[in-house]
UniProtKB/Swiss-Prot annotation:
Major role in the synthesis of nucleoside triphosphates other than ATP. The ATP gamma phosphate is transferred to the NDP beta phosphate via a ping-pong mechanism, using a phosphorylated active-site intermediate. ATP binds at residues 11, 59, 87, 93, 104, 114. It comes from Psychrobacter sp. (strain PRwf-1). The lineage of its organism: Bacteria, Pseudomonadati, Pseudomonadota, Gammaproteobacteria, Moraxellales. Keywords: ATP-binding, Cytoplasm, Kinase, Magnesium, Metal-binding, Nucleotide metabolism, Nucleotide-binding, Phosphoprotein, Transferase. This is Nucleoside diphosphate kinase.
Length: 143
């Protein structure tokens, strides 16, 4: 199995709900290591740039507004098949359709405020990690 890195964002609803620790525990319990982390309050430019691929979609403005409504926690997770594992832990985009025990089922209130973001492919992970982190902000954890 391949060791991968993926980007995770704990969104404003989950940060505001005081769920950071519980969400981090889920990552670590699944064998993912946190190798980079920071709390940010995104502005329109940073959030809009991150979600630029959705610019023409009808939900884009609401998404940017939500992502700038409060602090987020961006993290780089590392582990075997980290991308798929992280997506499994997150659950379906719509919390109403998410499996029991997933982050979205337990901490999200709607498809619009769904607690977390995760990279959907190796290409996305590489691009998204570079968007928020410089090389020296992502650390090797050998211990």
């Amino acid at each position: 199995m391949a060791i991968e890195r993926t980007l995770s964002i704990i969104k404003p609803d989950a940060v505001g709900g005081n769920h950071i620790g519980a969400i981090y525990s889920r990552f670590e319990e699944a064998g993912l290591k946190i190798v980079g982390a920071k709390m940010l309050h995104l502005d329109d430019e940073k959030a809009g740039g991150f979600y630029a691929e959705h610019k023409e979609r009808p939900f884009y403005n609401d998404l940017v507004s939500f992502m700038t409504s409060g602090p987020v926690v961006v993290s780089v997770l590392e582990g075997e098949n980290a991308i798929a594992k992280h997506r499994e832990i997150m659950g379906a985009t719509n919390p109403a359709e998410a499996a029991e025990g997933t982050i979205r089922k337990d901490f999200a209130s709607s498809i619009d405020e769904n607690a977390v973001h995760g990279s959907d492919s190796a290409e996305s992970a590489k691009r998204e990690i570079a968007y928020f982190f410089s090389d020296n902000e992502v650390l090797d954890r050998t211990r």
